């Protein structure tokens, strides 16, 4: 049976960063990364942006050149999944039937796209935007003449895909079940702004609509039927309604968790010598009032990976990384600092009509998060307000001409 001192399951951002950080921190033991996809680790965010728009080729998305991993003596088993974890024996069962032993195990599998459960969900022409294969398949259909696309889901993935497809000249309809887009992650001001932007760019954006079924001919999707009976023509459908944490084998092995694998402040699961990081890990977040949650971002995956690598190397410290996020749509750059969970007030800096503004979120008078649209200085300086739990004067906070760094922390 093969064995490695550290086995990392998942070859995304978190898994790659953990392997890199192990070597950076002097780890000399054996490292194996097990990845479901056939590719070496690559950046995910550009899939729904630059790669989809053909502004970047795939070779520019690699987190490190493929030769890097061999140079650092990091082994990869690609195109492979873990189907079973035996925490007592410190042993994994792989999808090819092999067994693989580990000293420490890092679970970095992220999540699988949540799929529709309605009639017609198994038709061809229905896509997620999670992997290179997802995007390549959709791009091939566009090249073959697809003109009408329906995007189901008004989160960041759906909005980014809609923006790219609209710029490419396709007819895009975006459907959101809630009263506004980004309802789960942003305040009403930001939602209203992005809804207007997409409509102004030609997207048929509809909120408070429910999908009844997908209709098709000869096994291929041809439309989306709404609960009211209307059928929207669609030669392709993108589903962006969230992810389901890929944690089955760990939960089956006895790990605590439900919506993600529960980890402590050191990213340790309830099973011995097993860590979990990234989108699949649920932890008590200091920047969300200690609420247990999963944070789906590159920043979180990378920083958790580094935290675990340092712990394995003997430098164990609690995970306290500052959360941040970004999204590019059209010529708009959104930068988010902090987590706005439970906010009770917002302050607008700048003018949304000028397409350059910030939304500051407060809870009990303290700054907890910012959404900055084409306002880089606000983002950079506002991070410190969030980190400090600042209680600034609201009139000064609303003055876009006053730098955030000048406000009382």
Curated annotation (Swiss-Prot):
Q: Does the keyword Oxidoreductase apply?
A: yes
Q: What class of enzyme is it?
A: oxidoreductase
Give the enzyme's EC designation.
1.18.1.3
* Obligatory cofactor(s): FAD
**Gene Ontology CC annotations of this record:** cytoplasm
Keyword line: FAD, Flavoprotein, NAD, Oxidoreductase
List the molecular function annotations (GO) for this entry. Answer: ferredoxin-NAD+ reductase activity; oxidoreductase activity, acting on NAD(P)H
Q: Known Pfam families for this protein?
A: Pyr_redox_2, Reductase_C
| Binding-site positions, FAD | 14, 49, 82, 130, 279, 298
What is catalysed by this protein? 2 reduced [2Fe-2S]-[ferredoxin] + NAD(+) + H(+) = 2 oxidized [2Fe-2S]-[ferredoxin] + NADH
Q: Which InterPro entries match?
A: FAD-oxidoreductase/Apoptosis, FAD/NAD-bd_sf, FAD/NAD-binding_dom, FAD/NAD-linked_Rdtase_dimer_sf, Reductase_C
| Assembly and interaction partners | Monomer. The dicamba O-demethylase multicomponent enzyme system is composed of an oxygenase component (DdmC) and an electron transfer component formed by a ferredoxin reductase (DdmA1) and a ferredoxin (DdmB). In vitro dicamba O-demethylase assays in which DdmA2 is substituted for DdmA1 demonstrate that the two enzymes possess nearly identical activities.
Job of this protein: Component of the dicamba O-demethylase multicomponent enzyme system involved in the degradation of the herbicide dicamba. In vitro, catalyzes the transfers of electrons from ferredoxin (DdmB) to NADH. Both NADH and NADPH support enzyme activity, with NADH being markedly more effective than NADPH.
Similarity remark: Belongs to the FAD-dependent oxidoreductase family.
State the PANTHER family in the record.
Answer: APOPTOSIS-INDUCING FACTOR 1 (PTHR43557), RIESKE DOMAIN-CONTAINING PROTEIN-RELATED (PTHR43557:SF2)
| Protein known as | Dicamba O-demethylase 2, ferredoxin reductase component
What is the organism field in this record?
Stenotrophomonas maltophilia
This chain is encoded by the gene named ddmA2
